[in-house]
Design a protein with these regions (language model features):
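Acidic-enriched catalytic cores of C-N bond-cleaving enzymes acting on peptides and small amides
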Residues: 1
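Short helix-loop capping/hinge segments that flank enzyme active sites or metal/cofactor-binding pockets
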Residues: 9-60, 67, 112-124
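Short, surface-exposed loop/helix-turn segments at secondary-structure junctions
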Residues: 10, 54, 83-101
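Structural helix-boundary/capping segments
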Residues: 47, 53, 57, 105-149
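Small-aliphatic-rich amphipathic alpha-helix that forms the alpha element of a beta-alpha
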Residues: 65-67, 93-114
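Glycine-rich, N-terminal phosphate-binding loop of Rossmann-like dinucleotide-binding domains
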Residues: 80
């Protein structure tokens, strides 16, 4: 799993599918979508079909490998983000969704819990469980929640 690479790959799929689903807004220069959304959709529209196919195959392989991990473990525990919380008034780190994207790619139930620590800025952990194993995720996360407070 390469968090940065796989997050970017997933984003390409989202932008490509968004361009297809919002094509009526994209072709209408008078539509009220933001410049940033238009730019992202245009990027997605221009991704070559063979690249999309390859990306989907790569993400499917990751999904399969991730789901196989759950044959031996109940949960995957990671930080929610690769860094501590940032100031909302400043530009956000581009990699802030690197760890959360694994749940999206692999169809995993996931949740984040704040960690009440002595660090200067907030920190949280993310728990991922096997597909359709929400019950165990909620049960174990309630234990973590008590420990982290």
């Amino acid at each position: 799993w390469n968090p940065n690479l796989h997050r970017k790959a997933l984003l390409k799929i989202v932008e490509n599918e968004g361009a297809k689903n919002l094509s009526n807004l994209l072709i209408n220069n008078k539509s009220k979508i933001t410049k940033l959304l238009r730019s992202n959709l245009e990027f997605g529209q221009n991704i070559i079909k063979t690249d999309i196919k390859r990306i989907k195959e790569d993400l499917f392989k990751l999904k399969t490998k991730t789901q196989n991990i759950f044959e031996n473990v109940d949960l995957i525990l990671t930080p929610t983000t690769p860094q501590l919380a940032s100031n909302i008034e400043k530009e956000q780190p581009l990699n802030q969704a690197n760890f959360t994207s694994l749940a999206n790619i692999s169809d995993l139930p996931a949740l984040s819990l704040p960690y009440n620590c002595t660090l200067e800025k907030p920190f949280s952990i993310q728990l991922n469980a096997a597909n359709n194993n929400d019950k165990i995720l909620l049960k174990i996360s309630s234990i973590f929640e008590k420990i982290l407070q």
